[in-house]
């Protein structure tokens, strides 16, 4: 798959906050361009008029050959409390991610414009969701991200029932491995992703890996 020159500045031109550019809108063309060149949008919220496009100096990644499930969560998975589906309710997942309460954040970056753009990106086959459902068939948790060939860029996750988002994460990794994916871009490293083996690497190293493994989006 050939890649045209990006419409964005190079990630190595990011400022001290990891921002490479700002725009007043977000389109599928911009999303396709940014992910395949190591950049992602991170809006401040509905009240701001510009959308920052970011390439952090340090990047959170999960190399799938280093993935492991903590023993405590292995025991939780054996309870079989959830079932997993893929792409069964993408819009519901991204809206739930937007509504999730995050104590360490002042609000959600998933604005209505972001939801609209990613739902369209999903219809184009780039954005995918992994969902967990409880025994009653209710959506209990999930996550979504972008397929860039053998790289998968995770975006956001949520849970309504404890453990549901981690269950979705594990099922996502199992699915990605089956399709030959090498790494998940987690952007940042959280306690949850660190427990599965995520780590930080310099932006330049991430870009090198991305160029090596990026390709046509996968179909699940």
Predicted regions and their residues:
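N-acyltransferase acceptor-side catalytic subdomain
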Residues: 1-220
């Amino acid at each position: 798959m050939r890649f045209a020159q990006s419409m964005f500045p190079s990630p190595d031109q990011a400022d001290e906050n990891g921002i490479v550019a700002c725009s007043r809108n977000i389109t599928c063309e911009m999303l396709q361009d940014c992910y395949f060149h190591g950049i992602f949008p991170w809006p401040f919220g509905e009240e701001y008029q510009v959308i920052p496009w970011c390439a952090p100096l340090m990047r959170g990644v999960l190399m799938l050959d280093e993935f492991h499930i903590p023993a405590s969560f292995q025991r939780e998975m054996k309870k079989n409390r959830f079932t997993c589906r893929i792409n069964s309710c993408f819009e519901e997942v991204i809206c739930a991610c937007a509504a999730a309460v995050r104590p360490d954040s002042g609000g959600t970056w998933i604005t209505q414009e972001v939801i609209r753009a990613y739902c369209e990106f999903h219809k184009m086959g780039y954005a995918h969701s992994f969902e967990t459902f409880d025994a009653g068939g209710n959506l209990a948790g999930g996550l979504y991200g972008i397929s860039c060939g053998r790289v998968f860029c995770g975006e956001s996750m949520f849970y309504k029932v404890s453990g549901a988002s981690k269950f979705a994460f594990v099922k996502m990794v199992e699915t990605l491995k089956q399709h030959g994916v090498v790494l998940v871009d987690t952007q940042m490293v959280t306690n949850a992703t660190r427990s599965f083996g995520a780590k930080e690497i310099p932006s330049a190293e991430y870009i090198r890996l991305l160029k090596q493994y990026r390709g046509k989006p996968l179909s699940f």
